[in-house]
């Protein structure tokens, strides 16, 4: 034993390196063990739903999964098959997985797809936007859009995951929680933005549209990968050297928020008795007729704004969902063009992690419908749900509570008012 410790002391560099390697290996193995425990617990919970009996005349629920294998730098397929697929199969659903091969394929497939009970998106913001656009471009979108949508966050950017699921630093737990939310069946309504250019078909967004210098610098961050943790600040610093001040000129016309109509019951109420129907007919017959002027809807008031901004964003409220709001609107945020170079680098670096961050002095407008007009010859690009589109004049319309998404029951309870209040 003495000789053993003497050898360790004489070769202390190798001993130190070996201990570090052993510690790292133990930590890695422990993490894998914890991930397996999470998967097992999620599968056991899903199996409870799969073991439930269904009526003889009922059919097994069909789920169609749109999987983007290229998401998360090509790791999405492995993440889905290890963490999500077993849960879906154990839940008793008839699962069909559609793997997309190229950008825009999900959009085309959805325009032709037959009806299903559940649509599941396994990918990031780009895949989700394709699926939503494909659903809402269908000729029968009024009925097809009622199909609930599940979102399994596998991409590098998954903006809605913070709204729909509990926060988790563990990737495996985040994916299993999202998949279990689909199995449990709790849903929340989310707004959609319809963005229409002059010629092309409309594009639909769950998060919003960004146009400006912060966005342009953010997409160049990967170009400076060799700078490691400094790459984000470097992208914004070099952006200030190209042109300064960076301003974007445009004009925008918009209408204000609209009152939210009462929520319609999902189940059809029972037909009233014959006696009640007769009384209702008599009451409507003897009721005073309304004047035509009282039935007229007041015309919408449009407001015009000329803007000079460093960045413009038009966003839904899905990232800060309020189920009890009495108004429906989208946010138009006009950030000031007086931002200094230092603030541009600091704020821009934070915006890469949190696109909802705003510079001091930002003007926010509430609108239900707007048109954005750009000066002739304007170059650059929009980001619509993290996907790049050519900058052009667009019409943006809010479709309030258009789609229903599966949500973690714990998150849904937090959005509703407490019964004790």
Swiss-Prot record:
Key words, A-Z: Acetylation, ATP-binding, Kinase, Lipid metabolism, Membrane, Mitochondrion, Mitochondrion inner membrane, Nucleotide-binding, Transferase
Q: Which InterPro entries match?
A: AGK_C, ATP-NAD_kinase_N, Diacylglycerol_kinase_cat_dom, Lipid_Phosphate_FormReg, NAD/diacylglycerol_kinase_sf
List its EC numbers: 2.7.1.107, 2.7.1.138, 2.7.1.94
Segments carrying the region annotation (Hydrophobic) are 15-31
> What's the cofactor?
Mg(2+)
Q: Give the pathway annotation.
A: Lipid metabolism; glycerolipid metabolism
Any one Gene Ontology cellular component term annotated for this protein: TIM22 mitochondrial import inner membrane insertion complex
State if Transferase is listed as a keyword: yes
Could you tell me which PROSITE patterns the record lists for this protein?
Answer: DAGK (PS50146)
State the Gene Ontology terms under molecular function.
acylglycerol kinase activity; ATP binding; ATP-dependent diacylglycerol kinase activity; ceramide kinase activity; lipid kinase activity
Ranges for domain DAGKc come to 58-199
GO biological process annotation, one example: lipid phosphorylation
Signal peptide start-end:
none
Record-linked SUPFAM superfamilies: NAD kinase/diacylglycerol kinase-like
Q: How does it assemble?
A: Component of the TIM22 complex, which core is composed of TIMM22, associated with TIMM10 (TIMM10A and/or TIMM10B), TIMM9, AGK and TIMM29. Interacts with SMIM26.
Query: Which family would the database say this protein is a member of?
Result: Belongs to the AGK family.
Describe the task this protein carries out.
Answer: Lipid kinase that can phosphorylate both monoacylglycerol and diacylglycerol to form lysophosphatidic acid (LPA) and phosphatidic acid (PA), respectively. Phosphorylates ceramide but not sphingosine. Phosphorylates 1,2-dioleoylglycerol more rapidly than 2,3-dioleoylglycerol. Independently of its lipid kinase activity, acts as a component of the TIM22 complex. The TIM22 complex mediates the import and insertion of multi-pass transmembrane proteins into the mitochondrial inner membrane by forming a twin-pore translocase that uses the membrane potential as the external driving force.
Q: What name does this protein carry?
A: Acylglycerol kinase, mitochondrial
Q: Which organism is it from?
A: Mus musculus
């Amino acid at each position: 034993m003495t000789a053993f410790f003497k050898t360790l002391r004489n070769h202390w560099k190798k001993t130190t390196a070996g201990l570090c390697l052993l510690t790292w290996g133990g930590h890695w193995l422990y993490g894998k063990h914890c991930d397996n425990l999470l998967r097992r617990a999620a599968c056991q919970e899903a199996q409870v739903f799969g073991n439930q009996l269904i009526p003889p005349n009922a059919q097994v629920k069909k789920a169609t999964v749109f999987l983007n294998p290229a998401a998360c730098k090509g790791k999405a397929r492995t993440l889905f098959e290890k963490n999500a697929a077993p849960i879906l199969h154990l839940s008793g659903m008839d699962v069909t997985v559609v793997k997309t091969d190229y950008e825009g394929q999900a959009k085309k497939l959805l325009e032709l797809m037959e009806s299903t009970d559940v649509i599941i998106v396994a990918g990031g913001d780009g895949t989700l936007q394709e699926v939503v656009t494909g659903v809402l471009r269908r000729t029968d979108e009024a009925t097809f859009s009622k199909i609930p949508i599940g979102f399994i966050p596998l991409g590098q950017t998954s903006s809605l995951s913070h709204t729909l699921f509990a926060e988790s630093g563990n990737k495996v737990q985040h994916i299993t929680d999202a998949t279990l939310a689909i199995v449990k069946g709790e849903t929340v309504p989310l707004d959609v933005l319809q963005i229409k250019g002059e010629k092309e078909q409309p594009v639909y967004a769950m998060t919003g549209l960004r146009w400006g210098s912060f966005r342009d610098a953010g997409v160049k961050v990967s170009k400076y990968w060799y700078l490691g943790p400094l790459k984000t600040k470097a992208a914004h610093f070099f952006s200030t050297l190209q042109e300064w001040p960076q301003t974007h000129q445009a004009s925008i016309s918009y209408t204000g928020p609209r009152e939210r109509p009462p929520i319609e019951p999902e189940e059809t109420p029972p037909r009233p008795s014959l006696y009640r129907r007769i009384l209702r007919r008599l009451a409507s017959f003897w009721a005073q007729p309304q004047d035509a002027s009282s039935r007229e809807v007041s015309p919408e008031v449009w407001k015009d704004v000329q803007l000079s901004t460093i960045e413009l964003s038009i966003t839904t409220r899905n990232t800060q969902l309020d189920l009890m709001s009495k108004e429906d609107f989208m946010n138009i945020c006009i950030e000031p063009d007086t931002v200094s170079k230092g603030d541009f680098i600091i704020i821009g670096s934070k915006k890469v992690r949190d696109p909802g961050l705003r510079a001091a002095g930002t003007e926010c407008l509430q609108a239900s419908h707007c048109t954005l007009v750009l000066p002739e010859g304007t170059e650059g690009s929009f980001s619509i749900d993290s996907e790049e589109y050519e900058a052009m004049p667009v019409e943006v319309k809010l479709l309030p509570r258009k789609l229903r998404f599966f949500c973690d029951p714990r998150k849904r309870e937090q959005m509703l008012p407490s019964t004790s209040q």
